[in-house]
Amino acid sequence: KLSEGPFISYQRTVDVEMKESDCEVTETFSYKISAPFWHYLLHFPMKRALKNSNHSKKLNVWWAPPNRFDAQTSQTVSLLCVAAIVTGFLGALIGQTATFAAEEFGAGDRAQGILLATVRIGVLLTVFITALADNRGRKKLLEFSLYGGCFLAVLSAVAPNLWILGLTQSFARGFATSISILIGIMAAEAAPKGSRAYIAGLLTLSAGLGAGIPVWILFLADIHLKGWRLLFATAIIFFPAIRWIHLNLGESKRFIAHIENHQFNTARKQKIIIKRVLFLASVAFLLFLFVSPASQFRNEFLRDERDFSAAKISLFLLTAYTPQIIGVAIASKVSDLKGRKPVAMIAVGIGTILTVASYSIDGF
């Protein structure tokens, strides 16, 4: 029977059949993985790990987290990964379509730059939503942000001009950023201490999967001058998924404990390390000062400087960025074992050099 592990149900049966000179032992596993939506992906790796479990003292295979998850943690992380797909999709939409929208509206690079800068104002909405999370609950605001972001994405599909598109996407981007932050909070509160970077890696990969959806269907922009609108309309497919998250995702236990302690005045005041917060905020500011224009103007660069069509951009991005999955998987595992700081320094340093090189070299 199951004592601990990421299973809804688990049973191991050993049958021994005696023969003349020896015996035959048959080991059977019957289990159901507590990983909504992702259990199909985990079936064969888990099957192989259990099959080889007798050959090693530990079942902690290379793809598994450093700490063993229980069923509740596994379910929570799985559902948060689905939410991460949504935020990845919402966050990538304007960057992939801005150049095509500008073409329809007869706008130049300057107007496109203003559009992309205006979208960043949505961070004010993010601050407001996340500030409420400590009083209203993480789950409630996560669902609100998911619905709000997808609704505004669909609304962007019928934007009559570039400025209305910028307005709707400003709020949509604010919701998308709120989703990312709330997912991170809920994941950190649900995760064992030694597996937080691992879970952050899973969420990053899931968000990358969501960001890849606009890339996969970018060829629609080649169909017609207004074809880019179909990418925004695609957000409608996420509404059933959000409803499913609502039915299966529980509120953070840490938030529930916080509310109970607050009611009975038993909560201890925790000290915020201001210097560390300011340092991390400064690092994030400088990083996005470089990353944002490099990513937001990438498609414009590929169209104007490399003469790429929408379909060719899709092929290029899928070919160039898919191998990043390996890097994220390795970095998240190493971060839990060796520390976050050295991994971040190496990744940011090498990534910056390669990004600059990609825009500086003429290609082949």
Each predicted region: which residue ranges?
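Hydrophobic core of transmembrane alpha-helices in multi-pass small-molecule transporters
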Residues: 85, 152, 164-178, 364
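Extracytoplasmic gate region of multi-pass secondary transporters
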Residues: 94-99, 275-328
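Helix-breaking motifs and short loop linkers at transmembrane-helix boundaries and internal kinks
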Residues: 106, 137, 158-163, 192, ...
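Central cavity-lining transmembrane alpha-helices of secondary-active solute carriers
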Residues: 116-131, 184, 318-331
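Structural signature of the two symmetry-related core transmembrane helices
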Residues: 140-155, 342-357
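Helix-loop junctions at membrane interfaces in 12-TM secondary transporters
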Residues: 157-168, 224-226, 359-364
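Cytoplasmic helix-loop-helix junction between adjacent transmembrane helices
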Residues: 168-205
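Glycine-rich segments within core transmembrane alpha-helices of 12-TM secondary carriers
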Residues: 195-222, 238
